[in-house]
Amino acid sequence: MDTILAGGSGTSDASDNTCTICMSTVSDLGKTMPCLHDFCFVCIRAWTSTSVQCPLCRCPVQSILHKIVSDTSYKEYEVHPSDDDGFSEPSFEDSIDILPGDVIDLLPPSPGPSRESIQQPTSRSSREPIQSPNPGPLQSSAREPTAESPSDSQQDSIQPPTRDSSPGVTKTCSTASFLRKVFFKDQPAVRSATPVVYGSIESAQQPRTGGQDYRDRPVSVGINQDPRTMDRLPFRATDRGTEGNARFPCYMQPLLGWLDDQLAELYQPEIVEPTKMLILNYIGIYGRDEAGLKTSLRCLLHDSTGPFVTNMLFLLDRCTDPTRLTMQTWTWKDTAIQLITGPIVRPETTSTGETSRGDERDTRLVNTPQKVRLFSVLPGIKPGSARGAKRRLFHTGRDVKRCLTIDLTSESDSACKGSKTRKVASPQGESNTPSTSGSTSGSLKHLTKKSSAGKAGKGIPNKMKKS
């Protein structure tokens, strides 16, 4: 084999080859044994997880050679065809409900019909030994759990502590590899995505609240739920000891890298990590629901919510695309996404720092600080005082230019019902005339009549006098 490796394409020739699985340049060369065909290691490892035949010659693959440095320095990844028997057998139902107190027997598959090996649930006291009423060839009365002489088959079974009020249930599955993949957290790249299944060893260590409430939430385990193709988004990490993004699957790293860079543009460094964990929690709740994500994130992102959610869902689709799970490493910078510039500013704030209401009557007068600088201030009132929005009305004649300032601020709580008190101030020192009219047009008409009557004969146009 040393001679074959020396004569074959080593790491120096990996850049000249093309992987027939991902149709890209070979990255991290992997050679199949015994046919010695070249592929990307991640591609051929994902291929052999579903089929043990070589993609080129269709011969059975026994192992995969990778990390080839020299003829004597390499690593070998063994392929076990028996690990996938549980997913190919038609013996299981669509789902298996696992409740607290269930005992899962991890025995080899029986030679007979596998449907008969699944025992019906039987109610027994939790203090009695759990066994089948009619012991078969795979389950006999000699397998009773005893403290004096524990057997080897006892170590393969998962027996969590049960309560007196909960019945014991025995379920025997025909394939041990299927249940090992469901319960044990040793799958590559999805360690933090494994849910806590009630009835396993890990669930016995989890705190339970609400008495028997957890019994109302059985966990359904599907047959074709391959750990490499997740149906849900694994963002609720449980590995608290792992720092940074290492607790999440490797195929989610482009999305996590974009979140780090984007949130660093919008927020202060000390709140980037808590904000990222909150956003990932919302993704775990809403998934790809764009409306739900926008509603939940609007309090954090304000006007930047729309483009932020659009970019996030775009990267989420690329990360979870099954055709990209076996491709080479990529980052969000390889896409056309551009970062949103920050910082985040709360919208619709007045010059005094008070957030305006959502009422259309207020927002059409004061929306931005640029419009506030165009308003005039009443004589004797300090600039910046909370007296509401001011609007100028210009009436131009041949030699007169009058400026009326109208204060539309409510002086009582009755402003919410639509009744507002309006005051009129004249630059020539005329007395203020309060008007309680319900419509703005009526108040303006009244003010126009008063001003035209006071300035009669001073060059005011005839059109204004008639009005």
Curated annotation (Swiss-Prot):
Span of zinc fingers (RING-type): 19-58
InterPro entries assigned to the protein according to its UniProt record, in alphabetical order: Znf_C3HC4_RING-type, Znf_RING, Znf_RING/FYVE/PHD, Znf_RING_CS
Biased composition (Low complexity): 149-161, 429-443, 450-459
SUPFAM superfamilies the record matches: RING/U-box
EC number: 2.3.2.27
Region of interest called Disordered, as start-end residue ranges on this chain: 101-171, 205-238, 344-364, 413-467
Group of enzyme by EC: transferase
Domain of life of the organism encoding this protein: Viruses
Gene Ontology BP terms: protein monoubiquitination; protein polyubiquitination; symbiont-mediated perturbation of host ubiquitin-like protein modification
Physiological role: RING-finger E3 ubiquitin ligase that degrades host SP100, one of the major components of ND10 nuclear bodies, thereby disrupting the organization of these bodies. Also plays a role in the inhibition of host NF-kappa-B pathway by blocking the SCF(BTRC)-mediated addition of ubiquitin chains to host I-kappa-B-alpha/NFKBIA, thereby interfering with its degradation.
Complexes and interactors: Interacts with host BTRC; this interaction seems to inactivate SCF-mediated protein degradation in general.
Record protein name field: E3 ubiquitin-protein ligase IE61
The organism of origin for this protein: Varicella-zoster virus (strain Dumas) (HHV-3)
Taxonomic lineage of the native organism: Viruses, Duplodnaviria, Heunggongvirae, Peploviricota, Herviviricetes
